[in-house]
Amino acid sequence: MKRVVITGLGIISSIGNNKIEVLTSLLETKSGISFSKEMERSGMRSHVWGNIKLDNYQENIDRKIFRFMNDASIYSYLSMKQAIEDAKLTSKMYQNNPRVGVIIGSSSGSPRCQINGVSIIKKTKRLKSVSPYTVIKSMTSSISACLSTLFKIQGVNYSISSACATSAHCIGNAMELIQLGKQDLIFAGGGEELSWELACAFDSMGALSTMYNSQPILSSRVFDYYRDGFVISGGAGILVVEELNYALSRSAHIYAEIVGYGTSSDGYNVVVPSGNGAMRCMNIAMSNIQEPIDYLNVHSTSTKIGDLIELNAIQQVFRKTSIPILSSTKSITGHSLGASGVQEMIYSLLMLKYNFIVPSINIFKLDPKAKNCNILTTMMRKELSIIMSNSFGFGGTNVSLIIKKFV
């Protein structure tokens, strides 16, 4: 099997719009959570989010394609531009090349575009009033459709949509295709819009934090006893995933090698995880790993049930060894749903490169059931070699990715 490495990254997130801004926020444990007037006006109970702050984002986007793009596509476009520059790829290396592809997904497409379309019909009573661009904007494959066109990609071109595991699946699938020799390079990741139209559904099911509306930066509190739900976020992330020899042939900078990918299904409950699927997933990812995991960026989102189920699964997986250092970057960033897997992989890559571990913040009283789980609550400087990142989603879908420092 061919070896697979990561040579470039780009990100738009609640804690920064490029890798330097994101690195600074991580090192300072600077929260990206803020008050949302939009959510308050909509009548939601939760008034906090991990907002995306962008200026002049339409700049240099072909208008013929821009009209088809939703917010997630725009975030992903900006991330892909960064990733291409970061990987030092010339247009000749990726344009019109059948060995270069895109696998970029979204968990929801664009509820904002869908609701806008329906609202126009209700208001005008005319189907023809709906924008002809609504279909493309609303598709969960909108990102890959738009980016493959803008960047002239001729290799694989599709999206995976698997709730909050979406972009992690995209990375894992990219790894497999390259291992099998079907592609040399794949742009992999995902994006998610941030809007009341998307957030309201989670608010209605009681999944979002509501207790800390007046203190937004305290609202995402993974493993804290008083956690009361997750904080919704958005953005995008793109990785340049390459076959090792292909990367070496062009003297590419290598962030890390992807050495493990596990995926599984709970087959248990649509919204409540079983824990068994997560255990199988982590074990599959580690099946060819000999060295210990130095750090695990958990999926845990700040929900009463989900956080403890993941911790129990981790305890079972590592019961014969020692539990790796654990933390959740979502305590700083919020939960960007389909974009979370790739964003958290980027946070992990930066930690691996610069040898530090971001703590879980806002743990004022650790949940008693989370004791003795090696949860990090203060910034740590540590030489790192191997990192695991978990991403789980509704429907019992699970992904574990493992990266190793390339020496």
Curated annotation (Swiss-Prot):
Keyword Transport part of the UniProt annotation: no
InterPro entries for the chain: Beta-ketoacyl_synthase, Ketoacyl_synth_AS, Ketoacyl_synth_C, Ketoacyl_synth_N, PKS_Beta-ketoAc_synthase_dom, Thiolase-like
A Pfam family hit: Ketoacyl-synt_C
EC number: 2.3.1.41
Gene Ontology CC annotation, any one: cytosol
Domain (Ketosynthase family 3 (KS3)) ranges: 1-405
Highest taxon, organism lineage: Bacteria
Keywords: Acyltransferase, Cytoplasm, Fatty acid biosynthesis, Fatty acid metabolism, Lipid biosynthesis, Lipid metabolism, Transferase
Family recorded in the similarity comment: Belongs to the thiolase-like superfamily. Beta-ketoacyl-ACP synthases family.
Function, in words: Involved in the type II fatty acid elongation cycle. Catalyzes the elongation of a wide range of acyl-ACP by the addition of two carbons from malonyl-ACP to an acyl acceptor. Can also use unsaturated fatty acids. Catalyzes a key reaction in unsaturated fatty acid (UFA) synthesis, the elongation of the cis-3-decenoyl-ACP produced by FabA.
Subunit composition and interactions: Homodimer.
Protein's UniProt name: 3-oxoacyl-[acyl-carrier-protein] synthase 1
Annotated organism of origin: Buchnera aphidicola subsp. Baizongia pistaciae (strain Bp)
Upper classification of the organism: Bacteria, Pseudomonadati, Pseudomonadota, Gammaproteobacteria, Enterobacterales
Gene designation: fabB
